Amino acid sequence: MEYHIKEAAEKVGLPPHTIRYYEQEGLLPFIRRDKNGNRIFNETDLTWIDSIVCFLKTGIALSQLREIGELAKQGEGTATKRKEIFKEHKFKLMEKQKDLDKALEKIEAKIEYYEDMESNLLNHN
């Protein structure tokens, strides 16, 4: 099935201007256009847009996604390089996750500390 930008935007839950921005930034290298120059999206395009949104939430750099798009245009021979970009980003995410887990433990300890404090106050009143 094919979609114009308004329909595609509704499907992926983004405003059309965001999708246009992604294309301008080189993140959507395979978007086709109809005879009038309107963007045409297929299911694969929508899946990639959804992936971009997910990847951006992880903090990946636009430049890395742009590079992946450029490499994708070059074909399957660039799969190893694309995989390496994702592996590098995964490593950074795992390090960040360790930091977040440590911070979460500290927050949980503080919550427990304050719950104990509240409990002691209630028991003494």
Where are these regions (language model features)?
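Flexible coil/turn residues that form the inter-helical turn or adjacent wing/linker of helix-turn-helix
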Residues: 1, 15, 58
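Arg/Lys-rich, alpha-helical DNA-contact motif
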Residues: 4-6, 10, 29, 43-125
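Short glycine/proline-centered loop/turn elements that form peptide/ligand docking sites
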Residues: 8, 15-18, 35
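Conserved active-site tyrosine of GNAT-family acetyltransferases
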Residues: 22, 41
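Glycine-centered, phosphate/nucleic-acid-interacting loop/turn motifs that mediate DNA/RNA or nucleotide
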Residues: 26
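Beta-hairpin "wing" of winged helix-turn-helix
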Residues: 29-36
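Positions that flank functional sites
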Residues: 37-38, 70
